[in-house]
Amino acid sequence: NWCYDANSKFKWNVSKKSNSLKIQYNKGFDIKVPWELSRLQSLSKICVWSFLNKKKNLYTFIKNQVFDFIASNPPSYGVNWFNGMEVAIRGANLCMITDILIQENKLLPRERRIVYNSINDHMNFVINNLEWSPFSRNNHYLANIVGLLVMAYFLPRDENTLGILKFAENQ
């Protein structure tokens, strides 16, 4: 479950709009637990390790995890679409995972379209939810920009991706 804190057994509601969720602190559960899992960083590590060590038997597991995340976490709903930094990190990891799966011929054309659409959803969420302030720039904004660069560079070129790529390059 992508919205679950296994330490406290608390589950966030995936059917609530992300912008309506309230972060609660000191209640015995930690929103960062599902965020860490949902960044897909561990899946990226498994994917890179599989690629470097020619362990093709793990690609089915990796694909299943990617498609489970996409199916279980609709854009702008639930805890995993709460802020741009989390979405940007996950989007960049999806790009790396997808690139390896494509190189290894492990994605059918329809599967590739599903993942591309999800990455596009991630990119559009980030560009529409930049964590920018006129008073300071922080790690969240940096993650937003780096994620946008990776996603816009990775996706097929169109007017939207080119515009986002140009924006991110100029930050």
Regions found by a protein language model. Give the residues of each.
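Aromatic-lined, polymer-binding surfaces characteristic
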Residues: 14, 24, 30-171
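N-terminal transition regions in large eukaryotic proteins
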Residues: 1-27, 32
